[in-house]
Structures are given as structure tokens and as C-alpha cells.
């Protein structure tokens, strides 16, 4: 039986994963900025779940929640960085405050959580980070400059952490979901505050698309939760766990595109070393 620690479990992927973890027979520490939004979950599963207040933008909040959870459960095996939200708008339309807040939540927040949990994992010589990425980090969209950039940065940072902490038995998996039927668009998508009409055909078009498909996304969050559990149970979990047909097709197209560009510019870029 494993003990999971999941950020952002008030709704969406986080709540779905916490429910699946309980059904799997494991224990879970559920967290949210507003504790009242997860207390109902603990009420449903009082023997397997405990709730903790956590804000990924506040280091002291993270440390306190992790320490309390470890004290209550005795051990933490899996730490899931799920808390986050989107920001839609062309770069020129986003305020400094919006950019910094989004990056603080989606990039710096997971780094804070991993940094705080690493001493626990290192001390017990084992642990698994599950970091929620985004298809926008495979290749980005007009309108997701800040959000996709933050998620891509988190993915690359996770790769470094995986290399740094591997000698201690620590594993890292970045989950890359396509469009899943959660409340992300309705409840977790911030809009840029400085709209510029000339971006209507790019960033504006993407926002319209997101609003149109909301509630019709092909991805099943319950199936995604089972895939994440399977990765945690695997002896050789993937670093990148791509979820859903859309994300798989997108990843393959991007790999083909990057290889073609690499090959096309090899005659220019390759012969730039000193001649020995």
C-alpha cells in the first residue's frame, strides 16, 4: 500500500486521481488552498484520506503540509504536482501580474513542492514525483504563450530533477494529457486583461475553440487516473506519460517536424565547431 500526496484536489484531475487511489487500496493526502473544498472527500474516506491546506506559491505552506502528512501517515511514496491553471491570451495582451502569477503556480510551484519533498524521498531512499504537464508543452498554441511556456519549463526542470535524484531511488514522471473532460476551461482558465483586437484571428480564435469544445473533450479523467496509477506501479515508469489519442498524434507530428527541420539545417548548423 502506497501513500500519495496530491496538490490541487478540489476538482478535476486531482479529485479524480485521489478517488482512484482510494479505490486502488492506497492512502492519500489531499490538498487545496481552501481546506473546505477537500474536507468532503476526507468525510467519504476517513480511514484512507487526510486533508491539508496548501498553496504552491507559499513555500512555508508546502513544507508544513508535507511534514504534517508524513507525520500522519508515516511515509509518503508518491507526490503529485497537479495544482495549476491556464492563462489564455496573446503575450501582448497579458499583464505582468498575470504572467508572473501563472508562472509562479505552474512552474515555480511544482519546483517548490519537489524541493520540499526531496529530503523526505532522499531520506527513505525512494519516491515518485508525478508532475502534470500539458499538450501545449509538446508544441504550443497561439494564446497559450505563458501557460504552455510554464508547463514546458516544468517538464525540462523535471528531467533535471530525475537525473539529480536517481541515485536516491527517486523517480519522476511528467503526465502529458490531451483535451480531457474536466472543469479546466470553465473554472481554471484565466483570460488576458489587455485584449488587442488584431489578435482575434490567432489567440482569440483559440479561445473560441476551447469554449466550443468544453464538455465535449474526448479524454476520460477516470481512465487517465488509472494510467497514472499503472505508471506508479511499474518497475520502469516512463519519464513522459502521454495520455489520449490527440496528445499521441500531436507528439508524433512534432517529432517528425523537429527531425525534418534538424535534417534540413544540418549543412548550416553542423560545421560550426573549431576545425581540429
Where are these regions (language model features)?
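Conserved glycine-rich Rossmann-like NAD(P)H-binding loop of the short-chain dehydrogenase/reductase
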Residues: 24-40
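Residue(s) in the substrate-gating loop at a strand-loop-helix junction
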Residues: 134
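The beta1-alpha1 cofactor-binding region of Rossmann-like NAD(H)/NADP(H)-dependent oxidoreductases
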Residues: 54-64, 96
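Active-site helix of classical SDR
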Residues: 114, 150-153
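Substrate-binding pocket helix/loop in short-chain dehydrogenase/reductase
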Residues: 90-91, 95-100
Amino acid at each position: 500500500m502506497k501513500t500519495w500526496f496530491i496538490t490541487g484536489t478540489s476538482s478535476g484531475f486531482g479529485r479524480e486521481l485521489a478517488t482512484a487511489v482510494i479505490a486502488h487500496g492506497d492512502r492519500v493526502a489531499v490538498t487545496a488552498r481552501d481546506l473546505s473544498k477537500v474536507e468532503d472527500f476526507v468525510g467519504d474516506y476517513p480511514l484512507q484520506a487526510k486533508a491539508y491546506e496548501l498553496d504552491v506559491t507559499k513555500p512555508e505552506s508546502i513544507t508544513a503540509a508535507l511534514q504534517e502528512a508524513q507525520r500522519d501517515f508515516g511515509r509518503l511514496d508518491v507526490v503529485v504536482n497537479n495544482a495549476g491553471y491556464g492563462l489564455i491570451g496573446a503575450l501582448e495582451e497579458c499583464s505582468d501580474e498575470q504572467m508572473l502569477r501563472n508562472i509562479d503556480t505552474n512552474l515555480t510551484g511544482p519546483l517548490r513542492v519537489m524541493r520540499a519533498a526531496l529530503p523526505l524521498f532522499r531520506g527513505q531512499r525512494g519516491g515518485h514525483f508525478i508532475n502534470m504537464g500539458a499538450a501545449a508543452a509538446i508544441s504550443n498554441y497561439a494564446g497559450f504563450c505563458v501557460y504552455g511556456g510554464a508547463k514546458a519549463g516544468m517538464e525540462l526542470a523535471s528531467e533535471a530533477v530525475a537525473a539529480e535524484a536517481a541515485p536516491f531511488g527517486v523517480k519522476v514522471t511528467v503526465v502529458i494529457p490531451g483535451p480531457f473532460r474536466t472543469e479546466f476551461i470553465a473554472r481554471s482558465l484565466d483570460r488576458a486583461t489587455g485584449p488587442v483586437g488584431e489578435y482575434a484571428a490567432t489567440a482569440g480564435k483559440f479561445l473560441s475553440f476551447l469554449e466550443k469544445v468544453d464538455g465535449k473533450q474526448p479524454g476520460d479523467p477516470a481512465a487517465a487516473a488509472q494510467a497514472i496509477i499503472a505508471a506508479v506501479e511499474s518497475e520502469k515508469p516512463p519519464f513522459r506519460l502521454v495520455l489520449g489519442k490527440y496528445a499521441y498524434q500531436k507528439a508524433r507530428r512534432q517529432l517528425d517536424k523537429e527531425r525534418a527541420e534538424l535534417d534540413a539545417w544540418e549543412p548550416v548548423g553542423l560545421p560550426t565547431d573549431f576545425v581540429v
